[in-house]
Amino acid sequence: DMKIGVSMSQFDDTHLTYLQQSMDEKAKSYPDGVVLL
């Protein structure tokens, strides 16, 4: 598994929430598995 650290200052912004969801979906699409921390 590959682990990638991600830091965002806030999640009360709709754009950042969509960004986080998209990153999670993309991470799950990799065959070896990527975990966003």
Curated annotation (Swiss-Prot):
<comment type="similarity">
    <text>Belongs to the bacterial solute-binding protein 2 family.</text>
</comment>
<protein>
    <recommendedName>
        <fullName>Myo-inositol-binding protein</fullName>
    </recommendedName>
</protein>
<keyword id="KW-0813">Transport</keyword>
<dbReference type="GO" id="GO:0042597">
    <property type="term" value="C:periplasmic space"/>
</dbReference>
<keyword id="KW-0574">Periplasm</keyword>
